[in-house]
């Protein structure tokens, strides 16, 4: 749970204090964004960890018609069929929704909560903002939530969710302070705090392996590859809402 570095812009000028009001706002902790495809880990985890699918399960990734709304697509392309791991690798929207449907909203919401997306992280900073999410029992909302829209989360919540995957499925409380010195000499460490187990060790390790393949040369995150290192992650397209409605 230790945070080694965290930055936010714009910041204020330390010499003139110009921009102090704007610079005091910490975007990583206090701002909310639709996470986009980075959120597909919840769809995959809910189905795999609950036994409804494996990473080798084939998923139909053709457009999914949603009554009363626009279909879920990968426009302008269509992948046809992909494994669950392939859905992450290629970042298929209809694939993610069909995976989420295997678990259903109640189970999906359980893992949504276990990942920490329904509560503040508890970081030792003031003013932390909690997420906002549409009612997923509504089919249209569920179709959008499954690939990261119709909800808003903080960058820190997303970071801690991915940290749980790296930590074999255990979600930690984030902390900026390792400890304090009492009387300038006695160091009192701040112990790490486990919040909960969000998935089995096997699911976490298999998911981690799938995220490594997202950086393959035919994955969506190939530019994140670093020679000599195993790099895992998930691409995502964040849309910002216009004040007048719609997206930038």
Show which residues each predicted segment covers.
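Beta-lactam-recognizing serine transpeptidase/beta-lactamase-like catalytic domain environment
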Residues: 2-37, 42-248
